[in-house]
């Protein structure tokens, strides 16, 4: 394929290209020392075989031999080649073998695999022992280690185990040394549990710790049978290794404690520095510190040391680990694997895309070539067609020049008339503008009046609410004042009572003091006199002994009776006080009831007065509402009648205007036709046929339809242009009016055959019956294919079908081809066509008398309308007054009702108080039984008191008689002294009685004072509360009155503004009526001027029609626009091509109806005249249309018209007879564009694939280089380690496929001392252990890990090898911590720290011992 950027051969070759490109240039750029070992300078450079695109993969293990520095490729070493081996470096100075082996030792090749391909070319390169000296290797190690050197490392200081496995309670294992510690103890003591505890903290599962579940890790013994949890805490510290070989603790970094706790429910928790954490955080932390938890290099368990070296060369499954994956993860090249796989998948997808795009490209190329011949033919046709269009353009422009010269004079006259009409219109527009301004002002005033009315209603409602609030507050004020007056009256009387009671109490207290003083004096006197009396009696003791004893006996008997008398006397006083209190209470309650009943009677009287007032106001309101409702009905009826009158008035105005216009047209038409008919009869003109509408007939039912669809039925039909010109000259000369003419000789022959119409609706032309067939063309020229529909629905269905039609309905609605709809309205056009019944077409014509009559009727109707409008306005004003008075009545009613409601609530409260007072009085009166009880009790007490006095009277008389006897015995002296004593006693009794009476009165007065003070406090509190409440209410009442005053002010302002606005509205109404009169006058003037313009425009129409046809023909000319297509054919300019090509197509000009004889016709004519200018080449563009030049007037006059017409005929014949598909150019252009697009698309796809290939090569090269660099270091370190451990053996890591290390993996080959090369699987147990340890130590040297835990790795080793391993761990691995469990003394004796483990009572314990000898030696 000629233009394909990628041939099939190239594509096949590219598909066979290897995934990894290893060219000489890349090898030369790779100069990293650590990726290769330089060969001797004297070694000749080998001839490398050319790398084939596809190569077979071999699974045969081969020994890796490195080439020179200029070439980094590896080759398999054949078994039959004899070469010197790599010199095995030693960390110690080389010594001569005791067995006589030379320093230059030569390695033997590993055994060939049976499956090794014999066809592969292999080169054996001899390595230089000098170049591979110990010094060179040491440089490589130092360079690598310096890049990964750390400042400090992590080590385990101690383990704290609590109830973990065999460790009961809390046991501390350690501390451990920073480098080499050994865990020792007898079998079964729990040494391996130390490692299990570390694994437990590092997140290993229970099965790795030789248990099934986590709960099995909890210690269980006879002493501790049911512990719930166990825990292990690993205490880490950071240590810095000094260059001297010692180490010190890094004090700047704090220690790290990681704890894990397991529970009986098999769950566990992690802690970092005693804060709860998670498995993820713990493992992330340990990995960041360099502990390899992925491949577990730090952990070598019992019996697992051999597994490291026995790994397969490459993992068989993705989930497995082989030696290749093991090394890649350590070296770090495993990160490249997903990127390489992603790029390889992209290349496969892109190869498919390239193949698909190439196939598409070939198809497009074939299609493009098949269109070449058609393209050339189409280009020739386009050239001829362009010449024909240019010639036609010249001919049209020449004819236009002739027509424009005829038009100039006509335009001047029309321009003058238009100017006059515009002046009148400007005046009219100013009047209209003023009317609109007045209407806007009236509307604004009306809105403001409406706003005032709304505000008025709002103020009325607000006043109603404020009045209600005021009444409520005034009633509350009255109640509070009444309450305060009552409280103050009570307060005054209470103060007076308190004053009287306090005075009485003070007086009684004075009397009490006076009586007490007198009693005291009398008591002293009585004692004195009694002492004298006793002395006298003592002197008469013997004489009166018996009598005195008798008196004493009687007095003792009388003593209880005296006590009873005193008690009865006290009870009588209490009963008298209770009786007095009951009588006083009843009197007060009776007085309270009488006062409340008087108040209720007054309130009821006031309430009745309010109810009568409300009833009267409601009657007035109902009467007002009825009156307003009736007024609204009358106003609505009058308003509707006014609107009807206005509609009739407007219709009459329209009729008057139409009558005037019709009269003017009829007079003009009649004059024109009559004059031209006379001219025909006189023989001065030939070929005049009359009005077009009179030259045929149509059915009556289509009169409105044809009159609406064809206003040109008023056109005059003549045979020739000359006849029409004579007619125009005659009309202009005699100023008879204007006419529009149809020239039969200039009409082209139309296809008059019937057409297929939607729904078979009739064509208007087919319904006309011409008087003479020669008039058919004239009718068709004005009617065309206009259809007649029965209704608007059918007209819509017909007009908007697949093919557009001009449709008119029988009732005069017209749908044009453009989709515009017209017709309808109050005035229906009719009478333009002669009807089949020969009815006159003068139905809508008016005589001057009829026009005068119509205008008189219009004036009368306008006067009636004005009177009716004033009456309606008066009704509206009266109705408004009624509406305004209604809220006042409602406010008065609301106020009275609120006052009545307030009074009713007060009355209810007063009645409730009366009921309570009556109930209290009735209760007090009904408690007569209590009063009777008190009175009876008082009588009973008095009777008992009298009885007691009667009982004691006899004894007192006996005592009196006995005392008289003593008096007789004592003589006058005794009698006189006894009289003194009795006199004093009587006085004392009188005073004691008075004192008791005073104390009782004082106690009562004190109670009255307390009671009056309590009443005083209550009254004062009531007065204070009422006063505060009264202040609040007075403040509210003040604000309410202010709000009412403000409301009144706003109401007055609103009403005044409303009156003012109404006056302004009336003034504007009068102005608007005056303006409307001037507008009506303008309409009459406008009709006259339009009639004049119609006459001028009819003269212009014919000239314009000729120019329009010529311009139409000129404008329809266009050169086929193939510029875009030809540009697409230009290969040099083609960048991107669109598939769509636009062509200029000739648009069919549909018939457009001529201007109607109304205002729109005249406006269109004015606009066309104003915008039309004769063709002026200098003032227009240089081109008629694209590619067609516009000629100047001089150029047009110099044209040879006959020659142009001859050429047009010749070219027209060629164009019509030649059958050419122009679309082939577009198709060819599209194919060419697609060809280039496909080509560019294919090139981009190939470029993208090559870019991905290049990225893949870079990734593979990076992976290969980095892996080989690390692999060589590890391999050479392995040699060193194995030779050191085995004292003369050799070990190598080899690539199974030396050309591609990642295809078959890595194998581990070992040559034990004095033996040949062997695979790791063929070694003994001890040899496997030594090989694995050598690999572990080599990996440690390449990528150290800070911690190693080894469990009896020396089990399969003899004494010598154990010592070698132990010494290596002690001397060469001081940059890591080794914790080794061992039972071999030549292993643990070299440790700096010994951790002893022993078991007692099934519980493991630990102790730590420092190896002083070793520490002193170091």
UniProtKB/Swiss-Prot annotation:
GO biological process, alphabetically ordered: cell division; chromosome condensation; mitotic chromosome condensation; mitotic sister chromatid segregation; rDNA chromatin condensation; tRNA gene clustering
Residues the record lists as N-acetylserine modifications: 2
Residue runs in coiled coils: 345-673, 849-1172, 1224-1263
Modification sites for Phosphothreonine: 43
Annotated region (Disordered), positions in chain: 1-122
GO terms for cellular component: condensin complex; cytoplasm; nucleus
Predominant cellular place of this UniProt entry's protein: nucleus
Biased composition (Low complexity): 107-117
Domain SMC hinge, chain residue ranges per copy: 686-799
Domain of life: Eukaryota
Function: Central component of the condensin complex, a complex required for conversion of interphase chromatin into mitotic-like condense chromosomes. The condensin complex probably introduces positive supercoils into relaxed DNA in the presence of type I topoisomerases and converts nicked DNA into positive knotted forms in the presence of type II topoisomerases.
Similarity section: Belongs to the SMC family. SMC4 subfamily.
Domain text: The flexible SMC hinge domain, which separates the large intramolecular coiled coil regions, allows the heterodimerization with SMC2, forming a V-shaped heterodimer.
Protein name: Structural maintenance of chromosomes protein 4
